[in-house]
């Protein structure tokens, strides 16, 4: 308990001694407790010093880490700026390429439309040329058959004329010994040729001239036919070579149709010459029959 100084002086000796002993015990207890508290405080202080050192070390590490992170951030910022600039350039380049591709696509679409139109025109032209080709082939077949018939008729006519010439030459062979006979009877006419014999000989000469002229025309016609065949073979070879070189289908069809049309025209001209020659031969034969009559 707490007593003032006057109270302590007024206490008797045994109470004062007891109070002293009590104060001494309390002091000892206080020393003991203060020593323990001091030890605890020292240990806590040591712990705090250790934690402080650790915190300082951590702060230094964090500072170093912060500096490193700042440097990295600066480097990253520079790299990001470079990458951003590169991406912008690439974006602008890609945008230009996109615009050029769009323009190219637009031109290709226009060209595709033109090609489709030309393809349709070519298909129509090919169908038209195909029909013309079929018509020309049919006409060529008809003309070839007619030409073959004309050739057969011309050969038959030539054979008949040769037989006619042989039949007209037989009486002359029989009459010639009579002409060479030196004996002349007084009642008989002079050994000169009679009017009938002279007429027959002139007709024979005229027939020979006509036959020679017709033979020449026939040879010319046959030569023209051979030339047409040779030209056809050459045209076929040229067509095969042109087709093998890889020319267009429309150009090949045009050339084939042109060649066929020229062939038809040549055959028409040949047939017209044959008709003219046949008409002239018929006129000559009719003239001969009238003169003989």
From Swiss-Prot:
The keyword Nucleus is assigned to this record: yes
Main location: nucleus
Cellular-component GO terms for this entry: centrosome; kinesin complex; kinetochore; microtubule associated complex; nuclear envelope; synapse
Effects seen without this gene: RNAi-mediated knockdown results in viable animals, but a small, but significant number of animals have nuclear migration defects in hyp7 hypodermal precursor cells. RNAi-mediated knockdown results in an abnormal distribution of GABAergic synaptic vesicles at synaptic termini of the ventral nerve cord. RNAi-mediated knockdown in combination with exposure to pentylenetetrazole, a GABA antagonist that induces seizures, results in impaired locomotion, stiffened appearance and an increased convulsion incidence as compared to wild-type animals.
Gene3D superfamilies referenced in this protein's UniProt entry, alphabetically: 6.10.250.1080
Compartment(s) of residence: Nucleus envelope
Keywords for this protein: Coiled coil, Nucleus
Annotated stretches, region: Required for interaction with unc-83 isoform c: 239-293
Coiled coil stretches, renumbered: 36-147
Highest taxon above the source species: Eukaryota
The keyword Nucleus belongs to this UniProt entry's keyword annotation: yes
GO MF term (any one): microtubule binding
GO biological process, one term: establishment of chromosome localization
Subunit and partners: Component of a dynein-regulating complex composed of at least lis-1 and nud-2. Interacts with lis-1; the interaction is direct. Interacts (via C-terminus) with unc-83; the interaction is direct, and is required for recruitment of nud-2 to the nuclear envelope.
Protein name per the record: Protein nud-2
Naturally occurring in which organism (per UniProt): Caenorhabditis elegans
Gene name as annotated: nud-2
């Amino acid at each position: 308990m707490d007593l003032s100084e006057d109270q302590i002086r007024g206490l008797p000796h045994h109470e004062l001694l007891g109070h002293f002993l009590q104060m001494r015990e309390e002091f000892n207890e206080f020393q003991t407790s203060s020593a323990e508290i001091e030890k605890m405080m020292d240990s806590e202080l040591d712990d705090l010093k250790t934690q402080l050192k650790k915190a300082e070390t951590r702060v230094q590490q964090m500072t170093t880490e912060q500096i490193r992170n700042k440097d990295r951030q600066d480097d990253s910022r520079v790299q990001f700026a470079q990458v951003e600039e590169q991406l912008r350039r690439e974006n602008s380049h890609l945008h230009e390429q996109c615009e050029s591709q769009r323009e190219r696509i637009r031109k290709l679409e226009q060209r595709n439309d033109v090609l489709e139109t030309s393809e349709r025109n070519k298909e129509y032209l090919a169908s038209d040329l195909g029909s013309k080709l079929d018509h020309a082939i049919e006409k060529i077949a008809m003309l070839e058959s007619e030409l073959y018939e004309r050739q057969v008729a011309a050969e038959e006519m030539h054979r008949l004329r040769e037989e006619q010439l042989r039949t007209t030459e037989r009486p002359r062979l029989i009459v010639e010994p009579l002409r060479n006979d030196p004996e002349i009877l007084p009642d008989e006419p002079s050994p000169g040729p009679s009017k009938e014999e002279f007429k027959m000989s002139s007709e024979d000469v005229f027939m020979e001239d006509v036959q020679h002229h017709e033979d020449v025309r026939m040879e010319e016609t046959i030569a023209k036919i051979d030339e047409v065949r040779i030209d056809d073979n050459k045209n076929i070879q040229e067509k095969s070579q042109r087709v093998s070189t890889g020319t267009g289908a429309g150009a090949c069809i045009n050339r084939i149709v042109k060649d066929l049309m020229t062939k038809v025209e040549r055959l028409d001209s040949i047939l017209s010459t044959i008709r003219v020659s046949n008409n002239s031969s018929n006129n000559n034969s009719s003239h001969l029959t009238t003169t003989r009559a």
